[in-house]
């Protein structure tokens, strides 16, 4: 049975709430705060990008740039939070959110230390256990990356 944890009012999560919903931890937790959430519809989240991120050591030492795949991962984590806001997992520590597909990914600008990456994810549809989302990452109001994401939720013991 699904248990709704949200109402239709404007909702935001701090890092403590995020840590109860996502299994990710440092260095791969890529959402710092949920700024807005409308259950069944959309989420707006934030990733503060700092020079202390471990990936900047090698990407690239003279001109640090956040890897595009990690921008997409941040968007997927925001999508997971949108999904879990609709129906909180019965056993959060045993629930995994798998990224199962990506279409039409585009990278439009670099993301550098000091940027605030705004993660906008909109629910598109749910069919046969697959959630589909439209996702856009922005810095200073300009699109940094966009993609269509597909994800599924499984318990750890049922995972492939």
Curated annotation (Swiss-Prot):
GO terms for biological process, alphabetical: fatty acid biosynthetic process; lipid A biosynthetic process
SUPFAM superfamilies tied to this protein: Thioesterase/thiol ester dehydrase-isomerase
Gene3D superfamilies from the UniProt entry: Hotdog Thioesterase
Assigned keywords, A-Z: Cytoplasm, Lipid A biosynthesis, Lipid biosynthesis, Lipid metabolism, Lyase
This enzyme's EC code(s): 4.2.1.59
Catalytic activity: a (3R)-hydroxyacyl-[ACP] = a (2E)-enoyl-[ACP] + H2O
Pfam families assigned: FabA
Active-site residue list: 59
Family membership: Belongs to the thioester dehydratase family. FabZ subfamily.
Function: Involved in unsaturated fatty acids biosynthesis. Catalyzes the dehydration of short chain beta-hydroxyacyl-ACPs and long chain saturated and unsaturated beta-hydroxyacyl-ACPs.
HAMAP family referenced in this protein's UniProt entry, alphabetically: FabZ
The protein's name: 3-hydroxyacyl-[acyl-carrier-protein] dehydratase FabZ
Taxonomic lineage from the root: Bacteria, Pseudomonadati, Pseudomonadota, Betaproteobacteria, Burkholderiales
